[in-house]
Curated annotation (Swiss-Prot):
This is CRISPR-associated endoribonuclease Cas2. One of its GO terms (molecular function) is RNA endonuclease activity. It comes from Capnocytophaga canimorsus (strain 5). InterPro entries: CRISPR_associated_Cas2, Virulence_VapD/CRISPR_Cas2. Belongs to the CRISPR-associated endoribonuclease Cas2 protein family.
């Protein structure tokens, strides 16, 4: 399971710039990685864990701007086609889910 955060935050004033940088820093502190500009991804081992991280994102929302949070399955993530300058790239590696008995 992957949690994807997409955002568009205003940076017109120093306070808005600070809020946008703080939001980005908090995403990174919570284990999210930059996928594209204003798009961060985090792998979660289960749906329950993904919900925990979605709640954390909701708690750190800045006052202004747009933020979208979505979850995608490992299968959907693996089916993603990524291109860089018309050259196809492999998506970031997915993680092996360990089963404990």
């Amino acid at each position: 399971m992957w949690v994807m955060v997409l955002y568009d935050l205003p940076t017109e004033t120093k306070a808005m710039q600070k809020a946008a940088n703080l939001f980005r820093k908090r995403l990174e502190d919570d284990g999210f990685s930059l996928f594209q500009f204003s798009i961060y991804l985090r792998h979660c081992p289960s749906r329950e864990n993904a919900e925990v991280h979605k709640k954390r994102v909701k708690m750190m929302l800045p006052k202004y701007g747009k933020v979208a949070v979505m979850t995608i399955t490992d299968k959907q993530f693996g089916d993603m086609e990524i291109f860089h300058s018309k050259v196809r790239e492999d998506p970031p590696p997915t993680y092996q889910q360990l089963e404990l008995f």
